[in-house]
Amino acid sequence: MAQRYVRIQNQEGQIYYGLLQPSFNVQVLDAPPWLQGQPTDLILTPENYQILAPCAPSKIVAVGKNYADHAAEMGTPVPSEPLIFLKPPTSIIPSETEIKYPPQSQRVDYEGELALIIGDRVSDCTPEIAQTKIWGYTIANDVTARDLQKQDGQWTRAKGFDTFCPLGPWIVRELNPGARLQTFLNDDANPVQSACIDQMVFPPDVLVSYISQVMTLLPGDVVLTGTPEGVSALQLGDRVRVEIEGIGRLENTVATR
């Protein structure tokens, strides 16, 4: 099993990065792992911590319509270059917490995605260099108020509500380029989304390079790589689970705000 890097909070409120062991004990690191954090002698057992989102980025850069089938279901052409937008860090929540349905919207959709974790400051770089700046991978749900997205024209409000970026549950360093991403609702065994991540229009190295030519990415920043076809509405009480082979599962429940 690949090493799983987590971010946790102990009962006293202290926040740590750590390595999740098969026993679910966490070996605490002395710094974020992408900043060369090293293992310490401190071990926390499952009853003594709660898992947080695996990083605390300065920004979340997301990519729209990066799977051709999703662009088609949205009734739009595939972009000729990456379509990027921002989500605020305050939208992040960990796995096993609640997505809050905002009263301003009548249509909130799930969007299961692969997330990249940036490990080093990167600015104006080539795809080859960009690949070396991707420290690891996790799972995201780019929750979207679809009606507000259409109403507003630009996406800040639709994508930016608190709780609209479930992220986690941990980070892995390596990922099979053909890993499958699937999204499930409630107890249905049939996925509502299913695609291999190598079906992206613009792969991760190209995305990071493109973004770096616009804005500097910092260690711990997050890049959301787009969602495949199959997006649809969430209802109050729904449980939405995004799975990526080689990483794990990200699960959240929809609740009233």
Residue ranges of each PLM-predicted region?
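Catalytic-pocket segment enriched in acidic/His residues
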Residues: 46, 50, 70, 101, ...
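A glycine-rich (often HGG/GG-containing) alpha/beta subdomain
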Residues: 27-29, 34, 86-99
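Structural signature of FAD isoalloxazine-binding scaffolds in flavoprotein oxidoreductases
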Residues: 78-95, 110, 241-245
